[in-house]
Every structure is written in C-alpha cells, then in structure tokens.
Amino acid sequence: MEDIIQLRKEIDCDLSLAFKFFTQNDLLEQWLTVKAEVNPEVRGQFELFWDPDDKENNSTIGCKITGIENERYISFEWKGPVQFKHFMNSADPLTHVIVFFSSDKPNRTTIHLFHTGWRQNSEWHDARDYFERAWSNALIGLQKRLAKNATL
C-alpha cells in the first residue's frame, strides 16, 4: 500500500491569496522556489527552479498541472532533487501533489496537501521522508512569510 504524504496547515490569509501563493510566479518565488514558471491551467506548466542556472537539476522542469479549480484546489506532477533524480524524474507516472484550500473564518485558510505516487523500495522511502520534511518546512515558511507582511 502506498504511503501518501498528508499535511494540513492553517495560514493567516484569505482563500484567494492562499490559492495565489501556489499559482502565481511572483508569490511562489517568495516562499517555495527561486524561479517559478507556472501557467495555472490544466496541462499548463508547473516548473519550479531552485538553481535557475541549472534548470535540469533541482527543478520540476517538464511538470504539468493536472487539475485546477480557482480557490479550491490545484494538482500537479512533481520531480525530485538531484539525489533522487535517477529514479524519481523518470518514473511513469511521476509523483503527484494535490493541494486543497478551505476556509471557515475570514483571513484564515486551511491547506491540505497530499503527495502521492511513492513506490515501495528503500530509495523511494528515503525520497518520501525527504519530501514529508520539505513540504512541512515549506508550509511553515509560507506561514512565516505571511506573518512578516499581512497586507500584500
């Protein structure tokens, strides 16, 4: 059975802004990556670059958005960093990230993040553990980013 990453994080912003932090290049570059090239539509690119001078490594080059509904959810393919590239980036299908947004209070949004597609061997277990930490830290970073400047 697959070991899905499931994370939940409440952040201090409205639903619209939370969604934009996953779909707008300038906002993605404020918390998740150095360079973003995202086209927020089904089959649009979802390419993030942590080293823009070496786009083939430590990036999601070639990844696509698989589903999107404004202020509700976004799903996209995902690749691994250089240490996992030899198996993650050639897997068919690639791993897959789904992010749902909900809000029951003004200026408070809950993000539900699921990362699926993990295979069952030790390399994949290491990659899965890496990404569980990475996504958790990224969501904490997003909350800290919002705390710095509550009005964007």
Regions found by a protein language model. Name each.
Residues K85-R133:
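Beta-strand/loop substructures that line and gate deep hydrophobic ligand-binding cavities in soluble
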Residues M1-E37:
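Hydrophobic ligand-binding cavity/cleft-lining segments
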